[in-house]
Amino acid sequence: MEQEICVIGFSGGQDSTTLAVWAKKRFKKVCLVGFDYAQKHSVELECAQKIASLLQLPYEIISLDFLENITRSALFKNSNDLMGYSHAQNKDLPNSFVPNRNAIFITLLHSYAQKIGASNIALGVSQADFSGYPDCKEDFIKSIEHALNLGSNTAIKILTPLMFLNKAQEFQMAKDLGVLDLVIKETHTCYQGERKILHAYGYGCDECPACQLRKKGYEEFQANKK
């Protein structure tokens, strides 16, 4: 176990929950930080709080509700955009993309890490099995790590252990870590905030892009077990 502090960008979803357990086994102290940016699936914040309690890890929420005033995304509560279409500002991206969201998140996590003396930040981003978001790719993460460290005269590492894992491999990772049941029953992925229907892969509407990706990953995970 490293005698260091690690800050986790924590949403209460499959990726960040698996990541939190991974980090808990490797660092002396792990701090979870979530963001309230007026997302439709704000129920994830409630799930995040519960998961943090179950994992016995400190959890803080940073309010970023101003985001919906300066950019556009189908993820915002007040958006009338329907999921599954191109972004109004960039046709090459899905309309669930929030421009510069991860850049803002990472910048704030970097500041928080400096405040508490953490030398590591861990993110649950992946470019192997993602929703078409360019700010989840390795080249972006490496670039912003370099820029933020230059701008603050620090050497904080941004760790992305899920970067090249698909959802099926993440389910396997959760199983190996002993938290598969927790990931299925307690984490939240659905963009619509559906928490009434429990599928084999977890709660969700079974229709939005996030649910479809998670469902596909779970089915592949199950198939690989046979």
From Swiss-Prot:
Annotated binding of ATP, by residue: F10, S11, G12, G13, Q14, D15, S16, T17, T18, L19, A20
An individual GO BP term: queuosine biosynthetic process
A Pfam family recorded for this sequence: QueC
Keywords from the UniProt entry: ATP-binding, Ligase, Metal-binding, Nucleotide-binding, Queuosine biosynthesis, Zinc
Binding residue positions for Zn(2+): C190, C205, C208, C211
SUPFAM superfamilies recorded: Adenine nucleotide alpha hydrolases-like
GO MF annotation: an example: zinc ion binding
Listed pathway(s): Purine metabolism; 7-cyano-7-deazaguanine biosynthesis
Required cofactor names: Zn(2+)
InterPro entries: QueC, Rossmann-like_a/b/a_fold
Enzyme nomenclature, EC number: 6.3.4.20
Family matches, as CDD domains: QueC-like
Cofactor note: Binds 1 zinc ion per subunit.
Catalytic activity: 7-carboxy-7-deazaguanine + NH4(+) + ATP = 7-cyano-7-deazaguanine + ADP + phosphate + H2O + H(+)
Known function: Catalyzes the ATP-dependent conversion of 7-carboxy-7-deazaguanine (CDG) to 7-cyano-7-deazaguanine (preQ(0)).
Record family assignment: Belongs to the QueC family.
Name of this protein: 7-cyano-7-deazaguanine synthase
Organism of this sequence: Helicobacter pylori (strain G27)
Lineage: Bacteria, Pseudomonadati, Campylobacterota, Epsilonproteobacteria, Campylobacterales
